Every structure is written in C-alpha cells, then in structure tokens.
Amino acid sequence: QAATLAWNAGHRNAAIITPQADNYLRLQNTFAEIWLNKGGRLVSRSTFSGENDYSDVIKRVMAIDSSEARADSLLDLLPRTNMEFTPRRRNDIDFIFLIANPGQGRQIKPTLAFYFAGDIPVYATASIYDGLNNQSTNQDLNGIVFTTEPWVLNSSDPLKTEITSNLRPVQGTLQRLRAMGIDSFRLYARLRQFADKEIDSLQGATGTLSMSENGIIHRNLDVARFVNGIATEAESS
C-alpha cells in the first residue's frame, strides 16, 4: 500500500531503510518487487542495526560519505588554509520507504534533516506508530506518512472506548491483535454475504475488508500523517 501511495504521489525513485533482521528484509524485498513492477527505480537499499546512532546509515543512503571522501581526496591535493567544505547529498531520491518502530523513527527523521534530507518525503509501515498520542515525543516524526489500522488511529471509536474502559489498556501490537479479534468475529457473520456477492467490502477495525474470487480476505489500511506530533488521517490517493 505504501508503494501505491508513493507512486500515485508522482514519486519514481525510491530509497529503502529497514532494520537488519530477516523478517524486515523480506518486507524490504516485497516492497522492492512491487515498486519495480510498477516501473519505479530503486536508488538505495540500506539496513540498520542497534538503537543508537543512525548517522552512518543515513550518510550512506544520501551518499554523504561519498561526498566527504571526495572532499578528503581534494584536500590532500590542495592547501588546507581557509578551505571550507559542506557535504552534498544525492539529489535523485524522490522518497524514502522506512520500516522502523517509533523510537527508531524519532531518531532517523531528525538525522535525515541533519544531513540535508529533511525535505524528502518518508513513507512508513504501521510499526512507526504505537497508537499513543504523545504529541511532544512524536514531534520528531512530523511529516511521515504511514498506513495503519482504523482501530489504532481512531481514538473516538465507541467500541474502542467501551473495550478500553473494561479491559487493560494496550498499545502497539496488542492493539492490533485486539482489532484482529474484533474483525474475525465480524467477518464470520458476513462470509456468506461476501460469497454471494451481496456485499463487496466491510469497514473493519483492521481496515476495509474485501474478499477475492478465491475466497481470500484482503484489507486496505487507513492512511495517516504525523502533523504537529499527532497521527492525523490523510488522503489515501
């Protein structure tokens, strides 16, 4: 879905940043395959490990390290007196596809700005948002577009309010598991209607649900953007 959003926004050159774990690498490969099939171009694929400094990976993605290396070579040949150097980032990236949790995202987005890439659109997976309205903490995520479940995004849902008041509050993955349970219950009563084509979609807690010709359930997530530290519903086209 992130690939479709980026493509419809007119972007064609993608950079991918993901954690260095097998399950995330599979997601990276899936996104890359979808993007290339659309006719897009991948200009950078990078991974990170750990929870500390993201400078190296961002410098690599934006080719800042190459710019610094060229400057060092030049300075080795010329007198260094009164010479100043400002690194330049590559200019062929239309957007960045990011897989990260909120803590990682809060470090990666400002690091992009530090390395002259704060103007590049960032599209992320649902993992970037834990469902908590930490406005001050989430300021560092401003501008990131991501897809997520309506249940996580909509804090005013009457059923969510009722469940939250009667059960232990949860966040992140547990919120999403709760939403899956709700949709499983709702879908069971509607499977015959789907099969008989009496309905073609159902607005669920995990997204807009539909059934393919071979009986597979698909879902379309809501689109959101961080604005002033708040996850706000955004246009899906």
Write out the residue ranges for each language-model feature.
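Surface-exposed patches in mature extracellular/periplasmic domains of secreted proteins
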Residues: A14-P19, S44, I120, L174-L177, ...
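Bacterial peptidoglycan biogenesis and beta-lactam-recognition machinery
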Residues: K38, F116-A117, F194-E198
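Extracellular/periplasmic Venus flytrap/periplasmic-binding protein
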Residues: Q1-G103
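Short hydrophobic alpha-helix segments
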Residues: R45-S46, E235-S237
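Extracellular/periplasmic periplasmic-binding protein-like sensory domains
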Residues: M62-S73, N91-I93, K109-I182
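Active-site proximal loops enriched in glycine and acidic residues that flank catalytic Cys/His/Asp
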Residues: T18, A100, A124-S127, T148, ...
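Segments of small-molecule ligand-sensing domains
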Residues: S165-E235
